[in-house]
């Protein structure tokens, strides 16, 4: 997929431009450190080797779509990423995309990185004729909730979601 130049916030436009690209296996070593930080943010142990293997499997099997935000002039730095998984709706008979992971590097926050990643994901969802995108976040993550709402996500008032943990005995 071609990259799309995206200006950061208006204060930084003169000195900083980012692009959003779809990740491939060649980006694996760039994504992994940020993916590890994402896992740590949610209280998980880093497991860099397992994290890399997980991402490699998703990319190799084409089981997810990962978008990367990168500085326009630097192919060695990732500002943020989002990972989407395909699903389907039996009721609407259409595709659904699950925005499962999104993370922005600490030094790239407040530059609209998450906003641009999600807008790219939304365009991909439209291009694949999806009926909707779904996202979940912790109840207390008000920053993420505001970002999601700013691009059009609405809290689901119709369905209550449940989780069934599967023990690994």
What is each residue range found by the language model?
Residues 115, 139-158, 164:
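Conserved active-site alpha-helix within GNAT-family acetyltransferase domains
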Residues 22-94, 100, 119-120, 124, ...:
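Acetyl-CoA-dependent GNAT
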């Amino acid at each position: 997929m071609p990259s799309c130049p995206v200006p950061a916030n208006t204060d930084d436009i003169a000195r900083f431009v980012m692009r959003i690209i779809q990740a491939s296996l060649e980006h694996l070593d760039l994504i992994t450190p940020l993916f590890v930080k994402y896992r740590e943010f949610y209280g998980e142990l880093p497991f860099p080797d397992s994290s890399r293997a997980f991402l490699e499997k998703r990319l190799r099997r084409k089981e997810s779509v990962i978008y990367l935000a990168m500085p326009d002039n630097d192919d060695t730095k990732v500002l943020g990423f989002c990972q989407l998984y395909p699903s389907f709706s039996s009721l609407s008979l259409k595709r659904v995309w699950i925005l499962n992971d999104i993370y922005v590097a600490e030094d790239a926050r407040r530059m609209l990185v998450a906003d641009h990643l999600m807008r790219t994901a939304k365009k991909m969802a439209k291009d694949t004729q999806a009926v909707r995108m779904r996202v979940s976040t912790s109840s207390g993550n008000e920053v993420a909730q505001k970002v999601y709402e700013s691009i059009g996500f609405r809290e689901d008032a119709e369905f209550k979601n449940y989780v069934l943990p599967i023990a690994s005995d």
